[in-house]
Amino acid sequence: MSAPDKEKEKEKEETNNKSEDLGLLEEDDEFEEFPAEDFRVGDDEEELNVWEDNWDDDNVEDDFSQQLKAHLESKKMET
């Protein structure tokens, strides 16, 4: 085979490889259809309590706050 013939064969192989690659890319572009789900099914159930009802207590004189105040007062006197 002569050099020009070898070059033509290489070009044909490269063209074939490119067309195969394009075929694979086109398959990736398709979107998969999923069935629609009905999310309202759980609406009939009783609502769950996600957080504690007493999270926003106005009780600032609880045991922790008293201990903290006492600790801070003792630190003030030490310095």
From Swiss-Prot:
Swiss-Prot/TrEMBL GO biological process terms: double-strand break repair via homologous recombination; mRNA export from nucleus; proteasome assembly; proteasome-mediated ubiquitin-dependent protein catabolic process
Keyword Phosphoprotein present in the record's keywords: the answer is: yes
> Which residue positions does Phosphoserine occur at?
S19
Which residues does the annotated region (Disordered) include?
1-30
Q: Where does the record place Basic and acidic residues bias?
A: 1-21
Q: Which Pfam families match?
A: DSS1_SEM1 (PF05160)
- A single cellular component GO annotation: proteasome regulatory particle, lid subcomplex
Cystine pairs: none
Cross-referenced InterPro entries: DSS1_SEM1
Q: Which UniProt keywords apply?
A: Phosphoprotein, Proteasome
Similarity field: Belongs to the DSS1/SEM1 family.
Purpose: Subunit of the 26S proteasome which plays a role in ubiquitin-dependent proteolysis.
Oligomer and partners: Part of the 26S proteasome.
Protein name as annotated: Probable 26S proteasome complex subunit sem1
What is the organism field in this record? Answer: Drosophila melanogaster (Fruit fly)
